Amino acid sequence: MTSLTKKTQVMIQLTDLDVYKLGEQLSEMVWNNYDSWPEKVQRTIGYQIIQSSDSISINIAEGYGRYTPADRKTFYRYSRGSFEETKGWLRKSWRRNLIHQERMENYQQVIDVLGPELNAFINSTNKNYGN
């Protein structure tokens, strides 16, 4: 068995990564909330929060598909920025009474797990490939 074959066998699929799944879960939650908002909110906050929440998992996917470690880390860090942007939009939506208590608690449960998972994912990339 060649070393290439060994590496291929241990490569984890993108869709099996917990951090990717959590990013997808958060963006689906945002997407499902969007339809309940008035058109004004959809055209302002709605578009922004959909883009930022979708970018979390999309940037993980793009980084995962990149060849060089530097490229991977760049996109994983973009994902972290999109995560923070999404949290900001959620806080703003909460303050403007666009998200009710129960739904915000559901968002918070995912955020509380996704944040540390994303940090650990980025840190593991740094350990494996250097800063």
What are these regions (language model features)?
Residues 1-131:
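Amphipathic alpha-helical assembly/interaction segments
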